[in-house]
């Protein structure tokens, strides 16, 4: 995304006049979510300056600042582990995770999905989309029982939005740099990684060209 991200973190890049992350914040507020934790690293001081405390959306924003506290980005699983006390203060409640650099304008973070997830013993629930041209191999298959599969005739791409239980990250020491995929594979191997299709619009805003295509 350079040179755009030389001066602006990806989630604050604008699509149709609005920062990418604001689409998520508006949808989370509409879904009744009250507290949102934003993991930051690159140019992290720009996030509180741009978004404030969240009051304008009826949210309480909390910032988990990885650059300040650990000298750099902890990747997704490491970032979640650092933020667990804010994400799930009781240590058990599930929480949403969504990447700040994906465009999901119609995703409404359904409360019914949270209730269904809480009633099961799964550690994670992923939303999957058709494979984009830049990622034709996909990430996961989907079983008839709604579980993610490592191998399948048809694979789909994880849309970078999901529900998770704190237990999946409880063994990750704070400050560890760790990608999410090993933890997803761990839940999958235990038969505790759910998945479902998402048919709405979705874009991984990973290049200048893809960003321009959304304008």
List each model region and its residues.
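Catalytic-core segments of class I nucleotidyltransferases/pyrophosphorylases
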Residues: 88, 95-96, 103, 108-119, ...
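Phosphate- and divalent-cation-binding pockets in alpha/beta enzyme and binding domains
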Residues: 46-49, 82, 171, 213
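Conserved beta-loop-beta/alpha segment of the NTase-like Rossmann-fold superfamily
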Residues: 48, 54-139, 143
């Amino acid at each position: 995304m350079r040179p755009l991200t030389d001066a602006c973190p990806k989630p604050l890049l604008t699509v149709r006049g609005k920062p990418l992350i604001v689409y998520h914040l508006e949808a989370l507020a509409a879904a009744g979510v009250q507290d949102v934790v934003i993991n930051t690293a690159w140019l992290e001081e720009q996030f509180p300056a741009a978004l404030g405390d969240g009051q304008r959306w009826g949210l309480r924003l909390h910032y988990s600042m990885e650059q300040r506290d650990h000298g750099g980005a902890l990747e997704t699983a490491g970032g979640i582990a650092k933020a667990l006390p804010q994400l799930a203060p009781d240590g058990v409640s599930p929480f949403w995770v969504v990447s700040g650099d994906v465009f999901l304008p119609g995703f409404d973070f359904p409360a019914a999905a949270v209730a269904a997830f809480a009633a099961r013993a799964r550690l994670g629930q992923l939303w999957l989309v058709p494979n984009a041209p830049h990622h034709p191999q996909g990430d996961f298959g989907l079983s008839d029982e709604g579980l993610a599969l490592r191998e399948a005739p048809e694979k789909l791409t994880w849309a970078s939005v999901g529900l998770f239980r704190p237990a999946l990250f409880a063994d990750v020491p704070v400050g560890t740099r760790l990608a999410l995929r090993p933890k997803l594979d761990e839940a999958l191997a235990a038969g505790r990684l759910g998945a479902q299709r998402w048919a709405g619009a979705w874009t991984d805003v990973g290049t200048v060209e893809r960003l321009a295509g959304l304008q």
